[in-house]
Amino acid sequence: AATVGLVSAAGVAMERKSANTGNLKGNINHSVCRWCYSKIPMEDFLQSLNELGITAMDLTGPEDWPLMKKYGIHASMCWGAGLGIEKGWNDPKLHEELIKDYLQIIPKVAESGYTNLICFSGNRNGMNDDVGLKNCADGLKQIMPLAEKHGVVIQMELLNSKVDHKDYMCDHAEWGVALCQEIGSENFKLLYDIYHMQIM
């Protein structure tokens, strides 16, 4: 049986100063999501991250990575393939395009020294959850050999379907765990977002 991996979204934690030295301990690694700050020019944003001691950024693609490397900011959760949140792996009609996109981006993620690559189930659009799970597994299994070869971990994000992402299929941990078990690869995991899951 596959080991089910749950990866928490970037945590928001207070980094305390050492009482003796006044220096940061450096044992908490902060990450930020780029889309939240998209109005700030990238280079200005990266400079600010350096000043704040933040070491990583989520949801960035190949066009961002060279500048991120210049400032020593790690791409903790990559994107660069797919059709967005609503159109995902649960729709077999999209598999050909999704597979093509992911097979192109997986080597780029690895060559750039990164590990994690996000994916989405897509919306239900009237589809039964069991059917959607099988569809996701059938499609994702076709990219897993390349992900395994390159050491890239494909991660499907759990999102709430009550407030922010109405009709999204991967909206419960149980469904996501079942998908991990069906795929059966250590290189497929869940991106467990505590904001979204506490709503469900």
Place the predicted regions along the sequence by residue.
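N-terminal export signals
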Residues: A1-K17
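Active-site acidic/histidine proton-transfer and metal-coordination neighborhood
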Residues: G5, D91-Y192, I199
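Acidic (Asp/Glu)-rich catalytic clusters
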Residues: T21-G26, L46-E51, D64-G80, Q104-Y114, ...
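Boundary/entry segment of secreted carbohydrate-active catalytic domains
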Residues: T21-M42
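Hydrophobic faces of well-ordered beta-strands that scaffold small-molecule active sites
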Residues: I28-R34, M57-L59, A75-G80, L117-C119, ...
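Active-site-proximal loop/turn and secondary-structure-junction residues that shape catalytic pockets
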Residues: C36-S38, G61-E63, A81-L83, N123-N125, ...
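Short, acidic/polar
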Residues: S38-S48, G61-D64, H95-P107, I199-M200
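Mid-chain, structured segments of secreted extracytoplasmic proteins
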Residues: I73-D101
